Amino acid sequence: MNHSWMICARLVNGWGTGILNAIVPVWATETAEHKSRGQFVAIEFTLNILGVVIAYWLEYGCSFYGNGESSFIWRFPVAFQIPMLICLAAMVLFFPESPRWLVKMGREDEARYILGRLRGDSSHEDKELVEAELQDIIESCQYERSNFRRQTYLDMLFGTRSGKLHTGRRVQLVVWFQIMQEWIGIAGVTIYAPTIFGIAGMSPAKRQWIAGLNNVFYMFSTLICVFTLDRIGRRWTCYWGSVGQGIAMALAGGFSKLGQDARAAGDLSKASSYGNAAVAMVYIFTSVFGATWLTVPWLYPAEIFPLEIRAKGNTWGVVGWSIGNGWLTLLCPIMFQHLGEKTLYIFAACNAITIPMIWALYPETSQRTLEEINLLFASDSIWSWEAEKNLALLKEQGEVPERRNSVLSARRPSSSTDAARGSVARHHHKGSTVEVESKV
């Protein structure tokens, strides 16, 4: 193996993966209907983990070839990815473009056509709903352009030139969401699961296939999120995930310690029982994570940013993931070496910390259109309850205009994004008031 070429290839691979991580969730959220947006992204992660499972077992099987000395062990898994990439490159040509991106580019006729194909336009009522949704997107895009200038990545990070849209706050939320995702323990469990099983007293050979089986359970658990994420919302999904994961991590650490003590005392039967209990807790942790925290930190960045900078905003989420994942990947070996099973207690504590953070700082986005979500961040306060109060106030202040069968009035109780949007624009900013007139 040429190490220099392998490192170079890994850098190129990582660059491409980063692009896909930034684009795919945005594309999914912009093409999906608001009532099933979470479901679409959750399905994406089910397939993502399926790829992880295939990769793990492929490498595990190849490791036995040629007594572990043949170059086939690493050449075949690398080459196996090439047909997948060719298929992806060919299929992308047939994917529909995001209607919201087309509106942003001024290609409204194309956006209308694609939106009709995505939502269905077989009946007169369907066509009216499609047209109303398109008008919501157009007016939201016009509002965003009139209220803040084009932003660079640094502008987004520090919130400059964003006015009432508070893009700096949104960037901080998505970056820390991804860092939290890694610190709740998944980086340690997925990458260093064999080490955790070693703490529980398992042999090296057994650790490998137990870790692979854990990935299989991980994949199937993501299906839970497909059916629950849009029903109970993003916040409650994280709540119950943090509780389940925290308990599982604490018990895994406890059982690992008991197993080590039993083995030191010469009681191999008890050591094996405690070790199996620790493995069960790791399985439970991974399953709960797959059903909850795996998807939400990737979905949230794709939802909360304005259309003008949505792709850039999701890129900041990828930055947060890279920081959290890279940090823990380097730190975990040191933590396990010096702290042993106590590392799992740290992960348990991090799960507990995430609950008040989500409650206080992260407004709910479920069952809201991407255009309406902008109003959640019109409040000058960082607290989520203030954002909800401000949203309700904006809706009360504006009169509901008689629009052409508005999607919002047709699919939810009478509320108008346009009326609220006008109220946002009427907010005083630096002593001036901007009036936005709804065009009926």
Which role does the model predict for each range below?
Residues 1-117, 142-440:
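Alpha-helical transmembrane bundle of multi-pass membrane proteins
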Residues 118-131, 142:
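Short intracellular "coupling" helices and adjacent cytoplasmic loop segments at the cytosolic face
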